Swiss-Prot record:
Protein name stated in the entry: Probable serine/threonine-protein kinase ndrC
Keyword ATP-binding: yes
Disulfide partners: none
Active site: D840 (proton acceptor)
Upper lineage: Eukaryota, Amoebozoa, Evosea, Eumycetozoa, Dictyostelia
Species name: Dictyostelium discoideum
Length: 1335
């Protein structure tokens, strides 16, 4: 919303006066007020901008917005130009005067002029846009802007520096998390083929001094991650330096990557390696100094081992020299020089011994060693006695920046330097991954030999050849892996295997085993993850294994080299290694005992951590490559895939993920429909044959439903009339279905955009919501897809959206606003009752139908099942992540639960179910969404409160020029909402409703649903139910010429069809060069992505809610059900009839026919191609009229049956008749029974029978005319006249009638009544108008 400010500086009073122009240039009303800010905690005043609005006839606080827009922009441009001129004109010679002015500024007073009817909204200052020294004095036309001073004596506060809010998306590769419905889950999970990535983002305010390092430091603290492993990039993936000022970047979205993926640097590194000279022509440079801290710790550990293992006299001199070099406090550079000299000496010693025979305890002579790497953290291998290229590492060897230090003598051993992997360009080696099995098994990452120089997840592996060599005295195994590729050849890093690997489950090691017979290699590497959080945050990882990492290495058997997934395989590998230790010598017995104790401790710690399942426990698979290489074990994430393979993986991942979601949803709904049909057949008391025929029809409809989903639809079945809207994901058209003539709103979404934005689930959610039978929700009629687009055909509401209504009317009266607020609250609460949060409530998402009632649209941002998704939900996201990383989460959770059940006080504080994703329009977002505090369903009522302010005041309270300013206003909502100004022309009830809706989350109105609004005084004494039932005429009823009138849509484009980008041939076929005909360069995996179960037709609708309602309404014991149902329908149609009569248009919903044949003839005439669009509405009315007639006829039949049944039950309830009936049905002689009743032994019973015979029941009198009764009376001619009149005669007659009761009922029931019942059931259960029309 544009605002205008005239800022004048008064030199006499040294104050700033804001003159607000409201089309009265001659009058300036100023109310000066002095503001002292001696208290530093007081919030500094912010320059208030005026909001000018609306129409004068509505007394809106905002006036002439569109007219003032250009003037405001021109004024601001002039202001900035004057500031820039003053800034550039100042020089260093004016520093003294500038300082004097700065001192005088401390006593300035701020005088602000405001009007009582003008809303004041805090706005962020524009100081970052002008580069200006705070000590320089500005011109007379520029406002005085001073920065906040830390001194308590400062009298003039100033604005805080404007913060430009930016989003930083954290992409962290994590381990898999498997939980049930009651477990805590993170807000967003994206399931990949082999991993799960947790994506979250932070909204951070950027000022003129914020650098990339500040942001990374903040995120590392928030997420408990290592700062060195985080890298900042822009939205295009370009790396940003740490000292770069982020406000200079135009984009406001950044990416923070943990454990930078350098796959894109692989080819560059390989090309660089191919250009290098051979190893014999290179020189070995000293190690780099970027690992100074790690090098010192390794040297200290090496010193401890050298003091314990000084057994070899031949190596004592070198050992003492290395000890002295390490013990003396010297710089890292000098230590590297000495180590380099030690390596040269070792080469000379071994070259002199090359002619002597070698044994298992001696070192072999390698080729000439030179360095051909120019990056740090290289990987090396020791030479083999038999071959210069075969590796052999000494016992207890340690790889230390290019040197292998012998454990026995401490003498460095020359190593063959293999070509570096692309990951060697990494500045720092990664530590132990977070939440991996090794992080809970103890041991510091700095003390772990295997993880010190192991590269993670960046090695492409296709074909490998490996040679292994073992010795008797040094039982260490070193592995060299060579990549064989038609384009290049490269050696992978070498990794020694030690006993400490069993303590860490071989994490971070590449283990290969060669099969020389089949010329194949079996590659086994464990799943690896990014670096872990800081060491201080993981207290549960014990330090008992810190010294075991430097023990002597062993040679595992071939079976132990092939690792398997799961805990059992790891235990089996450790047992195999223990067996190999027995045959390797007695020198490793002590180490075996220590490792066994460490393994037992690790098992206990692993059992505590039982709520996570890691991906290394997933079943392995086998894959044979192009060169005959067998990949056994887990999927190698380091393998480089081609573009075609990546496309296929993405397509399969998206397809199967969505396929099974929709399949399970359909199966659940189908089960509910079958249960409803079975219940209906039982309650309707249908005979077996009729029930089977009726259920057969329902099963046929279910089959047609599935067949229509598979058949699909095409765009050429619709005729595009005009474009009525355009959004971020597609376009909205007004279209007509060619075969039925339905006027629909056709929403087209581009698949590539939807998939790129990860909005596939949102589209499915929107479709599911529109399928619900709800009067406030726009219904979905059709849905289909082609190769490039998704299409949703919905009901068309010709009244336009509510935004257009507000733009035309300006403001509404309280009575008009009350009507629309009641319908909006009903629409939102109906979604909440289904467990759905809309999250995007704004005027443009409410539309008006042809009668003027509210309909809710656009459910793309809705969210379902917050309670099921988040479970217990911690208070903040940080606590949730800490609980997941904590090793004692399960025990703490169980203690908290037990304390809660027992009524204890030490209960962890859990909040209500909340969500954390930030969605919605900026002006209508609640503070908890902007502040990322978690929200519930009441966030929709905050947005509705903003809409209510627009109805009554004509403007949005948080409106600003940029989204960043809008967010700042929302975060400072208590200062922004000037209630005395906003509510000065409103009633007390309306003002109270606004204050309660725009309130903090716990105290916000609507926490208990719509009942809170019904009890509010603004709605309490008004006709809420009448408005909901449609008995009150809306304040605005659209006046349209036809069903395709788009006069109420401001964005309608009726002339240029070339901009619609519509192809009747579905533009989705394959081209000659790839997907979509774009050639090989235009291949996109999302172009041909078919979303399963997306096709939908209203003719195949299987409404579950309608079936459940009918099952309840068809209660034959209550004869008033149908009359109540009919009266409700009449009440609902009363309002529509009154509107048509008042408008002078009878409409097309009123037709009366004398016979059914006339209706059928008229129906067939409407199906002709020349019929208008209104014929569909006429046919619908005919069906409803026929439905009412069937109801009335069937109701009369049921009433007769119920009356007859009631008479029979009353007749059988008489105690005397029950006694006589029991005697008669025993099979005794009728004459003897009558004589016994007439004897003197039972005078009371005879008198009772005679007295009861004097008043026979009316039912028997009415039935005396029946032939069955006459025949039964003739069968007893010998009875006396007195006994013929008693109830015994009546009971005999009733017995004869009951024997043939079923047959008489079937004969008397006419075929017409039976047909009416079948037709009524079919119409009630499935209102399938399309199939009826085709008939």
């Amino acid at each position: 919303m544009s605002r205008k400010e005239n800022l004048n500086r008064s030199s006499s009073s040294n104050s700033i006066e804001f003159n607000r122009d409201r089309d009265r240039d001659s009058s300036n009303i100023s109310n000066s007020s002095n503001i002292n800010c001696n208290n530093s905690s007081q919030t500094p005043p912010i320059p208030q901008h005026n909001s000018l609005s609306g129409r004068s006839k509505h007394s809106s606080p905002i006036h002439s917005l569109k007219k003032k827009g250009s003037l405001v922009r021109q004024g601001i441009e002039d202001l900035f130009s004057s500031l820039s001129v003053d800034t550039h004109s100042s020089s260093n010679s004016n520093n003294n005067s500038s300082s004097n002015n700065n001192n005088n500024n401390n006593n300035h007073n701020i005088n602000s002029s405001s009007e009582s009817s003008t809303p004041t909204t805090p706005r962020s200052s524009f100081t970052p846009q002008v580069t200006m020294n705070s000590n320089q004095s500005s011109g007379n036309n520029s406002p005085q802007l001073s920065s906040r001073s830390s001194s308590q004596s400062t009298l003039i506060p100033s604005n805080e520096p404007t913060k430009s809010l930016a989003k930083f998306f954290l992409l962290a590769q994590q381990v898999d998390y498997v939980g049930d419905s009651s477990s805590t889950l993170l807000p967003v999970e994206n399931l990949g083929l082999l991993s799960i990535q947790w994506k979250t983002y932070f909204t951070i305010g950027l000022n003129s001094t914020t650098t990339g390092y500040d942001v990374l430091k903040y995120i590392s603290i928030k997420t408990n991650r290592d700062l060195k492993s985080l890298t900042l990039a822009d939205s295009d993936g370009k790396i940003i330096d740490n000292d770069y000022i982020l406000t200079q970047q135009r984009c406001k979205k950044f990416v923070v990557v943990e454990d930078l993926n350098i796959d894109d640097l692989k080819m560059k590194q390989l090309n660089h390696l191919q250009q290098l000279p051979p190893p014999s022509q290179q020189q070995l440079p000293p190690p780099q100094s970027h690992q100074q801290q790690l090098l010192q710790q390794q040297l200290q550990q090496r010193l401890q081992n050298q003091n314990q293992n000084q057994n070899n006299n031949s190596n004592s001199n070198s050992n003492s020299s290395s000890s002295s070099s390490c013990s003396t406090p010297q710089s890292i550079v000098s230590q590297q020089q000495k180590l380099h000299q030690m390596l040269l000496n070792q080469q000379q010693i071994q070259s002199s011994q090359s002619t002597t025979p070698t044994n298992s305890s001696q070192k072999s002579s390698p080729n000439k060693v030179t360095d051909h790497q120019h990056v740090e953290n290289c990987n090396f291998t020791s030479p083999s006695p038999s071959s210069p290229s075969s590796p052999s590492s000494p016992s207890s060897g340690m790889i230390l920046d290019g040197f292998n230090l012998d454990g026995n003598g401490g003498r460095p051993t020359p190593l063959i330097i293999t070509p570096s992997s692309p990951s060697s360009m990494r500045k720092n080696p990664p530590a132990i991954p977070p939440r991996s099995p090794s992080s809970f098994s103890g041991g510091s990452p700095l003390n772990n030999i295997l993880l010190n120089n192991t590269e993670l997840i960046s090695e492409p592996v296709t074909t490998t050849t490996t040679t292994t060599t073992t010795t008797s005295s040094s039982s260490s195994l070193s592995v060299t892996t060579t990549i064989s590729n038609p384009n290049y050849t490269q050696n992978l890093p070498t990794t020694p295997l030690s006993n400490s690997s069993s303590n860490n489950n071989n994490n971070g090691s590449f283990i290969t085993l060669q099969d020389t017979t089949n010329n194949k290699s079996i590659i086994n590497n464990n799943r690896e993850s990014p670096p872990e959080s800081p060491m201080g945050s993981r207290k549960s990882s014990g330090s008992s294994n810190t010294t075991s990492s430097t023990t002597n290495t062993t040679t595992p058997s071939s079976s132990s080299l092939t690792t398997s997934s799961g805990k059992e395989s790891r235990d089996r590998d450790s047992k195999d290694k223990e067996k190999d230790l027995i045959g390797s010598g007695n020198n490793n017995n002590n180490n075996n005992n220590n490792n066994n104790n460490n393994n037992n401790n690790n098992k206990v710690e692993k059992e505590k951590e039982n709520y996570c399942k890691f991906l290394d426990a997933v079943n392995s698979f086998n894959m044979v490559g192009n060169n005959g290489v067998l990949f056994n074990g887990e999927a190698n994430r380091n393998m480089k895939l081609t573009n075609a393979q990546e496309e296929k993986c993405k397509i399969l991942d998206n397809y199967f993920n969505h396929y099974y979601q929709e399949l399970f949803k359909y199966l659940h709904q189908r089960h509910r429909r079958i249960k409803t049909i079975e219940d209906f057949t039982v309650e309707s008391r249908m005979d077996r044959q009729g029930a089977e025929q009726w259920m057969k029809k329902q099963f046929e409809k279910e089959t047609n439903f599935l067949r229509n989903k598979r058949a699909g639809m095409k765009l050429k079945e619709f005729k595009i009339l005009t474009q009525i809207g355009k959004g971020g994901f597609g376009q909205v058209f007004l279209a007509q279905k060619k075969d039925t003539g339905d006027i629909v709103t056709l929403k087209r979404l581009k698949k590539q955009t939807v998939e790129w934005a990860n909005q596939r689930n949102q589209v499915s959610q929107e479709k599911s919501v529109m399928l619900v039978d709800n009067k406030w929700i726009t219904k979905l009629l059709y849905s289909f897809q082609d190769a490039n687009y998704l299409y949703l055909a919905m009901e068309y509401h010709c009244g336009g959206d509510f935004r257009a209504l507000l733009n035309n009317l300006g403001t509404l009266s309280e009575d008009e606003a009350r009507f629309y607020m009641i319908e909006m609250i009903e629409a939102i609460s109906s979604l909440h009752e289904m467990g759905i949060v809309h999250r995007d409530c704004k005027p443009s998402n409410f539309v008006l139908d042809k009668l003027g009632h509210i309909k809710l649209i656009d459910f793309g941002l809705s969210k379902e099942g917050i309670e099921k998704r988040n479970g217990w939900n911690k208070a903040t996201m940080n606590e949730l992540r800490k609980s997941c990383l904590s090793a004692s989460f399960t025990s703490n959770t169980m203690k908290a639960a037990s304390a809660y059940l027992s009524g204890g006080t030490n209960v962890m504080a859990y909040r209500r179910p909340i969500a954390h994703s930030a969605v919605g329009s900026p002006e209508y977002m609640s503070p908890e969404i902007v502040n990322d505090q978690g929200y519930d369903m009441t966030c929709d009522y905050w947005s509705l409160g903003c809409v209510f302010v627009e109805m009554l005041c004509g403007f949005n309270p948080f409106c600003a020029d940029t989204p960043n300013d809008v967010f700042i206003n929302i975060l400072r909502w208590k200062e922004t909402l000037d209630w005395p100004l906003f509510t000065q022309e409103l009633s007390v009830e309306a003002a109270d409703l606004l204050k309660n809706m725009l309130m903090e989350q716990p105290h916000r109105l609507g926490g208990k649903g719509k009942q809170d609004f019904k009890n509010h005084p603004f709605f309490k004494n008004h006709n809420w139910d009448e408005i909901v039932n449609g008995q009150v005429k809306p304040p605005f009823v659209p006046k349209v010429e036809s069903d395709i009138d788009t006069s109420y849509f401001e964005d309608a484009v009726n002339n240029d069809s070339s901009t619609w980008d519509i192809d009747d041939n579905d533009c989705g076929g394959y081209g000659s060069g790839g997907y979509g005909g774009g050639g090989p360069q235009a291949r996109d995996p999302f172009n041909n992505l078919k979303i399963p179960f997306f096709t939908y037709r209203k003719s195949s609708a299987l409404s579950l809610s309608m079936s459940s309602e009918i099952a309840q309404s068809l209660n034959y014991n209550n004869g008033n059900t149908y009359s109540n149902y009919t009266s409700n329908n009449n009440n609902n149609n009363l309002h529509n009839n009154q509107i048509h009569e008042k408008n002078g248009n009878s409409g097309y919903n009123h037709f009366h026919f004398d016979s059914i044949e006339q209706q059928n003839q008229y129906q067939l005439s409407l199906l002709s191609p020349n019929s208008s669009d209104k014929s569909i509405g006429m046919i619908q009315y005919i069906k409803k009229f026929r439905y009412q007639q069937l109801q009335q006829q069937l109701q009369q039949h049921f009433q007769q049956q119920n009356h007859l049944q009631q008479l029979k039950s009353n007749h059988r309830k008489s105690p005397t008749r029950q006694l006589i009936s029991s005697l008669l049905y025993k099979g005794d002689d009728k004459t003897s029974i009558l004589q016994n009743y007439s004897s003197q032994s039972q005078p009371s019973l005879a008198n009772q029978l005679q007295s009861s015979s004097s008043s026979p029941s009316p039912s028997l009198q009415s039935q005396s005319q029946s032939p069955s009764l006459q025949s039964s009376s003739k069968s007893t001619p010998n009875l006396s006249s007195s006994l013929l009149e008693n109830p015994v005669k009546e009971e005999l007659e009733y017995k004869n009638q009951t024997e043939n009761e079923v047959e008489i009922k079937k004969e008397n029931e006419s075929e017409e009544i039976q047909s009416l019942r079948d037709q009524l059931k079919e119409i009630i259960i499935y209102e399938d108008y399309d199939q009826e029309y085709s008939i």
